[in-house]
Amino acid sequence: FGVMTMVWGIVITPLWSAVTDAVSNNDYKWIGDSLKNYLKLFLLVIVGAPIMLLLSQFVYRIWIGDMVQIDINLSFWVMSYNIVVMFSSIFVNILNGAGILKVQTISSLISPTVFLGVAYLLYIMGMGVPSILIAGIIANFNGFLLAPIQCVKLLRNK
């Protein structure tokens, strides 16, 4: 799943500076069109990630042999975490490029507490290693919840 995230990082990197340029030119239509295009591209992730999950046990055997057993449940949560991070990056990059940082700054102060609390709670409930990934997903509430709302507001107000 790291390969998928790495490729996505290469694809998403130009968005931030391109949005900054679009904002300076008052070209909010371009931002809206880019958002739609990135969401369409993200659909490939939604299709590709489950395929990678289905192939993961086979790839693990080739990669590390039988030395370490990686549970499919752990792979599922790694996949889910990466999907959330990639989805979030679309909206966060747009907001960063537009210079809209207040909500992100506040949520970045709250997020570590949410992460630690949820991770600890899930761990004592017996979730094991996946508790870290689940906590990471929940603590990323800015990226998958607040940032999309802010992007919609940004595009509606212009």
Protein language model features and the residues they cover:
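Membrane-interface junctions at transmembrane-helix termini in multi-pass inner-membrane proteins
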Residues: S80-I110
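Residue-level recognition of transmembrane alpha-helices
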Residues: F42, V78, N82, S108-L109, ...
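Helix-loop junctions and terminal segments of transmembrane helices
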Residues: T5-N25, N96-G97
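Interfacial transmembrane-helix starts/ends
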Residues: D27-L43, I51-L55, I72-S75
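Alpha-helical transmembrane segments of polytopic membrane transporters and translocases
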Residues: F1-W8, F141
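Membrane-interface helix-loop junctions in multi-pass transport and translocation proteins
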Residues: S56, G99-K102, P112-L145, I149-V152, ...
